């Protein structure tokens, strides 16, 4: 073991204590002694830490804790502290000290205690021994509520103690345990430096040199509020070496005394030694002041206090432990409390006792103690002379009697803790004793070898028997329970009792003899014997005389004792009656006044998403307006041209409907046309010669309204901008009527009456509904009650309308066709027998009867008559050609004249009429001989026709077209639509491979029907179980990954929550805000993990690479974007919970006292006694975590709202820009946690690895996407589709179905948009088909509409990033795959189909044996470019791998006469050219929406050996949801398993 000689330790102590920056050589030579440290270290060379600041108290008697370790004793074993104080220590003031001890001696004792010990600092984590106030307490519970609790926080303890009964808790002494002037100079070098002026060796003074400067940071003086006035802050408090040196003016006066004495000594030394520098002067003055302080305390004050002379000093005893004991603290402090008077006199040197001013109550003979605690800028002590008068007054005033009574100024009006302005000093002292684990009174006597009383009667006979009896009753007559504090006071009378005297004397002797720096120790080199004798002869009177400049005769020789011959006797012993009343208790409500602001702040934070939504709405509005401007740009010239011949106005459609702009055109053929703002014809009104035009004008409200009455139709109501515009139109109309020989009647009425008189379209619609209801009631023999009764109304306009004749437009609308269609014109002309341009009820009924009840011959004759345009009884080839052309109009198709001629010739040739130029009705009916059943079921489908009209149409098995029609039963059935026979035949057995023109060798099988009949019906629970099993099977990889990720997040949450709830380092935060800290810290860990690893879901290059590895069998990399959204939403929920947790925290922290917050946040708060916590807005807006948290909520609100699907569809650029806020998000997240308010930063633990991977992935993309790529070809296709063909970069490898991100240099280099490649991997160039649906794609179409140069320079270049993978790449992993594309969502399948056929032509081995491609489009012309690709696939598909079904949804979904004829023509066209009349393809063409459930059901029967079928859909959300729902429905059955992948556009 290494041994160190004492001399070496002395040298080490000298090196550590002597300043290293002397002013000069003379200075260095002048400090010939070892300078004493400020923190108490090395005062004892054997035990360096003895007496050091922060060292524990050392017990004289073993601890007395309830558990033997740290838990304090309390009720019911010991009495209530307040009850004990009120019962035992209560008594009248004004009892004079028996020994004539002065008040100066009492407060000098308090000053000595502040130099020796300080345990007022609360411990951490906060522990409370609250004092419960008995109900009805006159001071603290005058209203008898019974729920008043005075908070008492336990003191700071040594963390190395309190572990076991052999090592019980010991409190920590915050100051040095030596009598070394720490109350004057501070207990640390830094504290002393703050007190010094560093000039002339003096302590720093304020504007008045007699006063030190005021307390300020970083000098943490104790600054509680004034309990009398509530004044707060350091203003008016002085900087002393003792933290609580400003507690009372009396203690403050003693601090000022020693401050001035030090500066006096420094000034004297400076005069004597002019060459000394500041450090020498300061250290010499400090040395002399400390020695004088030690001498006065030990040899003048202590004997007067104990009435005992301490033993003579012999030598320094290094083996003696001088540490302060808790018993000494209790004995001395509590004995002083009995001597404190209710007031303190002030006098001058001539013995004149001053009247003191009380701002509230006037003048009084003395300062009231209870109203002087922590007083700021006392008007009675605003000068050095006033302080001198207070010191002289204390020297002349005799203290209270040394007994058990404590004045009410301490007992009831001591400065209170927390939100209480007052507390009970005695009760708090009792609790402090229990906190320190003080022994009982009898245990202390026994331990110190003193006589122990046997019973209660053995106490001091001077004790009031009633007090003794009451005390015994509180302790249940058990003397062994009597506490040290109570017993010590009860045994004292006039002088401290044996116990207190023994404890105090022992402590001071140990302090003296164990201190190496004691002034009488001649071996330390501090003083010579002459100097020691001089110091011993210096008394406090000498100090007072030197400082106050009063005559020595104005003070008695011993200022701690007043004798009869002493000068300036006090006027009288002060009582409470002579003084102002104590300011009563007040309770501070920390949150008072903060409620509205706190609520508004929370509401504002909750409204952040709404504010973001409002901003997004404004952005979407402007983007929509911009898009409309782009769309209108091409129509402006047309509109201007139309405005030349038309009149602009607003049409009023009816009440509670918005008016809309229209343009009125008057045509020479007596027609009035109403056009919308897109110049589309809304309505055509035919004005007949024998009709008079009725015009009604408004004569009020601006005279700008006009009503045009139209017989047998709804009226036209126009609103003009002004009367002049209306007048111009009326003149124009008058001229038009005159030129067309039309009569015009003009009338005027009020505008409101005009509106009531008008027959609106809505009213006309109700009349037509009744018209059709009764029409079908007569045709189909429906009961009148079922048809509905005609409404009876006396209104003239309704009676006129009930004559009800249909116009050509209404007739066309009822058939779902256009008025200008040839079919409409032919049918209308045929039915309009009287030729008046309208169909009456009877005329329509005659035609309807033929369709509803007529034979096939009647129907064909009707068709023949309709198209016999010249009425000669023959149908020429030209008329037949016209008929076919009218059929084609239904699909908006435009076949060439040659194609139509070929169709007509083929039909004539098929019927054997190739040599005829005209057909009779018999010939025409013969041509339809194969379609007798179709004609039999043909009806005229009318809107509003009621039930029973539509009948399923079942064409021949070799048909390439089908109609999807719903019967009423099907409309109400859950399965929706039946499978047409064309589909059943297409999917059935060997017929599946038949081409048109070839006859089937077997009858068409009814696979779909038979399969339904054979299916086993399961119960509801069984179906749900099967559906669940299929869901798990489909998404097992997704479920496992989500479960693992969720488990990690949950684990992080639980770990942090458990840590802070139970095993965190003792800071007290869990006890302060248990729910808030668990919620906030648990969610913080999970959110940190989520926001870190969400970056991996956006590492597109890494995902594309990994999906080609074996990991793709376990991780669904194609669901990265969905997983990204899921993480984002989960993180959002947890972020909200995190915010809620912090809202709880902020509220709790805003109502928690500063002492508690200083424990929870030691790096932020310092407990200076000011009590008040920070307001809520400080936490929100003035801290780094709070401010960054609010900013994070703002960023999240913007990012999430702008990332919503709704907004992305309206402004992709807004989404693109706001999503780049993620950089700001991560910066704020890092800053948010870096403040380490509760824990050390942990975000980097989660963030570092994903961030590095993400940055690497972005660098890979950056290296690619900054290469300019030339566009080879640009085509503008119908339906707003732009086809771009561009160079394929070198080394660019991709797979069919993948997508890329492009930026157009002409539109900005930073805005990238994702599009699916429509080129195949084997092609030399890349191609995209981009539909103009937003501003960016619309501008892209504009840019590429006009070439700018020659060659590759003709078009703006592109930046390319990708390729990236999607789930559609897995089509080849299934034996049977179904591809469903809707709208622009067909783009991935264009690449897949081309790739499939290419691989098939090369004879590549593929698992996939059959692909069904379902294309859903409004019209076959919508995406003609895809038709070309399908045509190419059909030409190269020699192995019949692909079966294409095209669903045209815009066709009339009615089985009427014209669609029947259309089907017949389609069939003949297929026979001739083996391709569709509409698309030119061999694909199956359907009119209607795809019936997914029957289609998938039939696939199970067609491919019974296949157990798993892949379904890949891409398109609008509605379509993909239907596919997903169908797959889930079929997966309930224990048959083929349908695995669905989808992507929404």
Swiss-Prot record:
Subcellular location: Apical cell membrane; Cell junction
Pathway(s) per entry: Hormone biosynthesis; thyroid hormone biosynthesis
Gene3D superfamilies with a match to the protein in the record: EF-hand, Haem peroxidase domain superfamily, animal type, Nucleotide-binding domain of ferredoxin-NADP reductase (FNR) module, Translation factors
Binding site for Ca(2+) 1: 832, 834, 836, 838, 843
Residue numbers on the Cytoplasmic membrane side: 623-1037, 1098-1125, 1204-1220, 1264-1545
Taxonomic source organism: Sus scrofa
Name of the protein in its database record: Dual oxidase 2
Cystine pairings recorded for this chain: 124-1159
């Amino acid at each position: 073991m290494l041994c160190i000689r004492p001399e070496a330790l002395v040298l080490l102590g000298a090196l550590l204590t002597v300043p290293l920056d002397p002013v000069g050589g003379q200075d260095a030579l002048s400090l010939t002694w070892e300078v004493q440290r400020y923190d108490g270290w090395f005062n004892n060379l054997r035990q360096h830490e003895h007496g050091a600041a922060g060292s524990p108290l050392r017990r004289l008697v073993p601890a007395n804790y309830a558990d033997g370790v740290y838990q304090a004793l309390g009720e019911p074993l010991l009495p209530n502290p307040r009850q004990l104080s009120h019962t035992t220590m209560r008594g009248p003031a004004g009892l004079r000290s028996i020994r004539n001890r002065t008040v100066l001696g009492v407060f000098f004792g308090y000053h000595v205690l502040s130099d020796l010990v300080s345990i007022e600092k609360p411990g951490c984590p906060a522990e409370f021994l609250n004092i419960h106030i008995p109900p009805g307490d006159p001071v603290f519970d005058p209203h008898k509520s019974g729920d008043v609790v005075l908070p008492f926080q336990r003191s700071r303890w040594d963390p190395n103690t309190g572990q076991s009964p052999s090592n019980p808790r010991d409190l920590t002494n915050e100051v040095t345990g030596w009598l070394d002037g720490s109350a004057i100079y501070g207990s640390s070098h830094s504290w002393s430096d703050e007190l010094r002026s560093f000039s002339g060796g003096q302590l720093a003074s304020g504007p008045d040199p007699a006063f030190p400067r005021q307390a300020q940071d970083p000098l943490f003086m104790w600054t509680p509020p004034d309990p009398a006035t509530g004044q707060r802050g350091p203003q008016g408090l002085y900087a002393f070496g003792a933290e609580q040196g400003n507690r009372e003016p009396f203690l403050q006066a003693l601090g000022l005394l020693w401050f001035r004495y030090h500066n006096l000594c420094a000034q004297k030394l400076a005069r004597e030694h002019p060459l000394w520098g500041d450090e020498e002067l300061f250290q010499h003055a400090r040395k002399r002041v400390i020695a004088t302080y030690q001498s006065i305390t030990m040899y003048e004050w202590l004997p007067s206090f104990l009435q005992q002379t301490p033993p003579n000093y012999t030598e320094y005893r290094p083996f003696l432990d001088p540490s302060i004991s808790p018993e000494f603290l209790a004995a001395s402090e509590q004995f002083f409390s009995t001597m404190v008077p209710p007031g303190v006199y002030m006098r001058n040197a001539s013995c004149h006792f001053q009247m003191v001013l009380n701002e509230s109550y006037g003048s009084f003979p003395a300062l009231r103690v209870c109203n002087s605690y922590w007083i700021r800028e006392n008007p009675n002590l605003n000068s050095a002379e006033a302080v001198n008068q207070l010191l002289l007054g204390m020297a002349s005033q005799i203290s209270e009697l040394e007994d058990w009574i404590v004045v009410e100024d301490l007992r009831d009006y001591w400065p209170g803790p927390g939100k209480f302005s007052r507390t009970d000093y005695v009760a708090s002292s009792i609790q402090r004793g229990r906190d320190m684990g003080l022994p009982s009174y009898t245990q202390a006597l026994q331990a110190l070898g003193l006589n122990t009383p046997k019973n209660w009667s053995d106490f001091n006979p001077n004790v009031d028997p009633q007090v003794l009896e009451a005390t015994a009753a509180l302790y249940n007559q058990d003397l062994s329970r009597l506490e040290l504090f109570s017993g010590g006071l009860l045994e004292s009378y006039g002088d401290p009792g044996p116990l207190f005297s023994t404890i105090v004397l022992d402590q001071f002797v140990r302090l003296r003899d164990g201190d190496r720096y004691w002034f009488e120790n001649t071996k330390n080199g501090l003083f010579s014997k002459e100097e020691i004798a001089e110091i011993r002869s210096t008394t406090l009177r000498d100090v007072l005389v030197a400082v106050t400049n009063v005559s020595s005769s104005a003070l008695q020789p011993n200022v701690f004792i007043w004798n009869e011959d002493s000068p300036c006797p006090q006027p009288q012993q002060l009582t409470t009656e002579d003084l102002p009343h104590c300011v009563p208790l007040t309770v501070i409500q920390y949150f008072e006044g903060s409620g509205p602001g706190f609520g508004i702040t929370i509401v504002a934070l909750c409204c952040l998403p709404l504010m973001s939504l409002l901003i997004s709405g404004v952005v979407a509005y402007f983007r929509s307006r911009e898009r409309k401007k782009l769309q209108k740009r091409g129509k402006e010239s047309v509109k201007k041209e139309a405005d030349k011949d038309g009149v602009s106005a607003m049409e009023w459609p009816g009440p509670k409907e918005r008016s809309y702009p229209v343009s009125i055109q008057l045509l020479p053929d007596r027609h009035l046309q109403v056009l919308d703002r897109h110049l589309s014809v809304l309505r055509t009104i035919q004005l007949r010669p024998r009709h008079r035009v009725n015009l009604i004008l408004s004569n009020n409200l601006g005279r700008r309204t006009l009503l045009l009455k139209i017989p047998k139709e709804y009226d036209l109501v126009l609103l003009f901008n002004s009367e002049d515009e209306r007048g111009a139109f009326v003149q124009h109309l008058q001229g038009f009527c005159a030129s067309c020989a039309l009569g015009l009647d003009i009338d005027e009425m009020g505008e409101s009456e005009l509106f009531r008189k008008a027959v609106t379209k809505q009213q006309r619609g109700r009349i037509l509904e009744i018209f059709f209801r009764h029409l079908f009631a007569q045709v189909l023999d429906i009961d009148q009650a079922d048809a509905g009764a005609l409404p009876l109304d006396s209104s003239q306009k309704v009676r006129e309308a009930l004559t009800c004749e249909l116009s050509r437009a209404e007739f066309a609308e009822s058939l779902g066709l256009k008025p200008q269609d040839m079919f409409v014109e032919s049918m209308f002309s045929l039915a309009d027998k009287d030729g008046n341009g309208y169909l009456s009820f009877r005329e329509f009924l005659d035609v309807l009867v033929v369709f509803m009840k007529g034979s096939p011959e009647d129907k064909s004759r009707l068709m023949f008559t309709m198209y016999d345009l010249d009425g000669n009884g023959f149908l020429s080839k030209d008329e037949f050609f016209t008929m076919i052309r009218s059929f084609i109009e239904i699909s908006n198709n435009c076949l060439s004249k040659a194609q139509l001629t070929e169709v007509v010739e083929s039909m004539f040739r098929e019927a054997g009429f190739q040599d005829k130029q005209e057909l009779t009705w018999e010939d025409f009916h013969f041509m339809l001989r194969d379609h007798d059943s179709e004609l039999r079921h043909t009806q005229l489908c009318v809107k509003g026709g009621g039930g029973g009209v539509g009948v399923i149409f079942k064409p021949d098995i070799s048909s390439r077209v089908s109609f999807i029609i719903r019967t009423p039963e099907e409309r109400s059935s859950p399965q929706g639509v039946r499978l047409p026979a064309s589909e059943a035949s297409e999917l059935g057995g060997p017929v599946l491979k038949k081409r048109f023109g070839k006859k089937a060798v077997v009858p068409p099988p009814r696979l779909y029907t038979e399969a339904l009949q054979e299916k086993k019906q399961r119960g509801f629970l069984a179906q749900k179980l099967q559906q669940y099993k299929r869901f798990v099977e489909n998404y097992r990889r997704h479920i496992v990954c989500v479960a693992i990720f969720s488990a990690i997040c949950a684990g992080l949450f639980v770990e942090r929550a458990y840590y802070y709830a139970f095993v965190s380092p003792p800071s007290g935060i869990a006890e302060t805000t248990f729910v808030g800290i668990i919620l906030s810290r648990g969610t913080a860990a999970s959110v940190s993990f989520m926001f870190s690893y969400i970056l991996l879901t956006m590492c597109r290059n890494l995902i594309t690479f990994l999906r080609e590895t074996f990991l793709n069998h376990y991780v669904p990399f194609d669901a990265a974007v969905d997983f990204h959204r899921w993480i984002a939403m989960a993180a959002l929920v947890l972020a909200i919970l995190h915010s809620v947790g912090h809202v709880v925290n902020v509220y709790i922290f805003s109502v928690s006292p500063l002492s508690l917050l200083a424990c929870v946040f030691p790096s932020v708060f310092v407990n200076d006694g000011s009590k008040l916590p920070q307001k809520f807005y400080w936490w929100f807006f003035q801290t780094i975590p709070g401010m960054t948290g609010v900013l994070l909520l703002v960023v999240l609100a913007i990012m999430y709202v702008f990332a919503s699907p709704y907004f992305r569809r309206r402004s992709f650029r807004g989404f693109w820009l706001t999503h780049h806020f993620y950089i700001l998000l991560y910066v704020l997240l890092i800053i948010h946690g870096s403040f380490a308010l509760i824990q050390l930063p942990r975000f980097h633990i989660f963030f570092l690895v994903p961030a590095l991977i993400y940055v690497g992935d972005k660098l890979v993309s950056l290296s690619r996407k900054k290469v300019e790529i030339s566009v080879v070809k640009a085509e503008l296709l119908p339906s707003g589709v732009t086809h771009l063909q561009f160079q394929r970069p070198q080394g660019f490898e991709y797979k069919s179905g993948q997508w890329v991100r492009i930026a157009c240099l002409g539109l900005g280099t930073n805005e990238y948009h994702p599009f699916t490649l429509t080129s195949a991997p084997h092609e030399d160039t890349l191609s995209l088909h981009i539909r103009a649906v937003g501003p960016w794609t619309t501008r892209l179409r504009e840019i590429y509409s006009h070439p700018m140069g020659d060659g590759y320079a003709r078009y703006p270049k592109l930046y390319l990033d990708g390729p990236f993978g999607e789930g559609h790449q897995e089509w080849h992993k299934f034996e049977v795959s179904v591809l469903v594309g809707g709208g622009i969502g067909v783009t991935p399948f264009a690449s897949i189909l081309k790739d499939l056929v290419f691989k098939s032509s090369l004879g590549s081995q593929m698992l996939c044996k059959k692909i069904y491609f379902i294309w859903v489009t409004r019209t076959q012309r919508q995406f003609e470019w895809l038709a070309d690709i399908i045509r190419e696939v059909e030409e190269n598909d020699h192995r019949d791998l692909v079966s294409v079904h095209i669903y045209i949804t815009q066709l009339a979904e009615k089985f009427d006469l014209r669609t029947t004829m259309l089907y017949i023509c389609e069939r003949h066209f297929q026979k001739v050219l083996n391709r569709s009349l509409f698309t030119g393809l061999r694909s199956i063409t359907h009119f209607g929406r795809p019936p997914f459930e029957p289609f998938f059901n039939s696939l199970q029967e067609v491919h019974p050996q296949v157990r798993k079928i892949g379904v890949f859909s891409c398109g609008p959300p509605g379509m993909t949801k239907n596919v997903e729902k169908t797959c889930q429905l079929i997966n309930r059955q224990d048959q083929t398993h349908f695995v669905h992948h989808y992507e929404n556009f």
